[in-house]
């Protein structure tokens, strides 16, 4: 069981942090590589547990995957994927069940090979993540989908058929799955109420480089099926959630961090909210410098919603900041039903948090105290790390392996800016 030990040395974090490629962009793009009969090369790939799990899934299907580390520093790695010799359509349960985005392999496998078998997707334990929208849309396109225990078996006779699909609510995963499924479908597929997150747009950009015919107009995506896709070279967009997490580290500790390698337009939905709680954000080409204005952190009322609104993946980290803010803050979680598991652990540090259904009310206090904590998922672990930076004494975070699913070398990056964090197994 991995543990993180954080000692509060009462130092504001000061320095520069390089932002990695986006976890939420690279995983669907890796799945989309199944659509190409020639190699793809991905740059700016983060070295994460989930990336290696997806690599194992692709290899289990017959792909050749080569992860090339950048030896100079922990960022900008390269991934080469060759799916020209796919010889299997069954994903191993042990691997697929650990990874939520394993379900995204269904669309490209159905589209190119007409069959796929996978397990119900795993990942973080943050409530229901229904795959019903994925299944319904694929069935509308002509797929036959059977559920056998924990397994999902999908087949199609001939080609998938282009259809007009309207999602009842915006879903990033369902949008991505249908886009990939539609690339080889017969005719035109139109998705209404599609997700338009930067990560979805990065997937579309990747597919178009390979030869896909995709047009997007606001929340409407139109895909005209093609006969084949070719490999390409693509650079993964920066991780806006990683950037937002480190931005909050600067605010919480009263420090000043330069975050290098950011798409400014992508992170605006985060920095706009941070400015309301007292952040000073200086923009430059490809990065930001973030610090806290004079005084305490301000309270806020925040709701998570699909892009371009405040992302659910930043909600736990923001809650950590609200624990030491002036006044009372309210956070409403509108994406996932069980994404307040970190609240119990923050209370162990002394935080004053009450939960009622999808709303958390946080009454800010002057200081937190170290404790023995247990992480439950990726973003909650990041939230506990942030809170522990300013908790008096020492804090131990158990089950910290979740962190490496979405953050490469977080402890090293924070330590380089003045934190005192160590890792043990």
UniProtKB/Swiss-Prot annotation:
SUPFAM superfamilies to which the protein is assigned, alphabetical: EPT/RTPC-like
Keyword list, A-Z: Cell cycle, Cell division, Cell shape, Cell wall biogenesis/degradation, Cytoplasm, Peptidoglycan synthesis, Pyruvate, Transferase
InterPro entries: Enolpyruvate_Tfrase_dom (IPR001986), Enolpyruvate_Tfrase_sf (IPR036968), MurA_subfamily (IPR050068), RNA3'P_cycl/enolpyr_Trfase_a/b (IPR013792), UDP_GlcNAc_COvinyl_MurA (IPR005750)
Primary location group: cytoplasm
Binding, phosphoenolpyruvate: 23-24
Active site positions, chain numbering: 124 (proton donor)
Biological process annotations from GO: cell division; cell wall organization; peptidoglycan biosynthetic process; regulation of cell shape; UDP-N-acetylgalactosamine biosynthetic process
Compartment(s): Cytoplasm
2-(S-cysteinyl)pyruvic acid O-phosphothioketal modifications at: 124
Coiled-coil spans in chain: none
Superkingdom of the organism of origin: Bacteria
Enzyme class of the recorded protein, top EC level: transferase
GO CC term (a single one): cytoplasm
CDD domains with a match to the protein in the record: UdpNAET (cd01555)
Classification via HAMAP family: MurA
UniProt-recorded name of the protein: UDP-N-acetylglucosamine 1-carboxyvinyltransferase
Species, as recorded: Wolbachia sp. subsp. Drosophila simulans (strain wRi)
